[in-house]
Regions:
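Positively charged, low-complexity terminal tracts
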Residues: 1-69
Length: 69
C-alpha cells in the first residue's frame, strides 16, 4: 500500500542549494520517508524505525564510506 506523503513536512540539509538533494519526512508511526528533491512526484522509500536506526548506525560507524584507490 502506498501512503500519500504530499502533505508531509520534508526537510533537507542546509548545505543543499539545488534540486539534487535527499529529502526526509518523519511519519507519525515512527517510520521515515526518503525522496529525491528533483523527482518529488515519484514514490518515496519508506523505512520502519528499526531499518532507519540500522542505517543511521551504519553511517556513524563508517559502513558506507567509500575507499579511494
Amino acid at each position: 500500500m502506498t501512503q500519500d506523503l504530499s502533505e508531509k513536512r520534508w526537510v533537507r540539509s542546509r548545505a543543499c542549494s539545488s534540486d539534487g538533494c535527499v529529502e526526509v519526512a518523519h511519519l507519525a508511526d515512527g517510520s521515515v520517508a526518503i525522496r529525491d528533491s528533483k523527482e518529488v512526484g515519484k514514490a518515496a522509500h519508506v523505512f520502519d524505525r528499526e531499518e532507519w536506526s540500522a542505517f543511521i548506525t551504519g553511517v556513524k560507524n563508517g559502513e558506507f564510506d567509500l575507499t579511494v584507490s
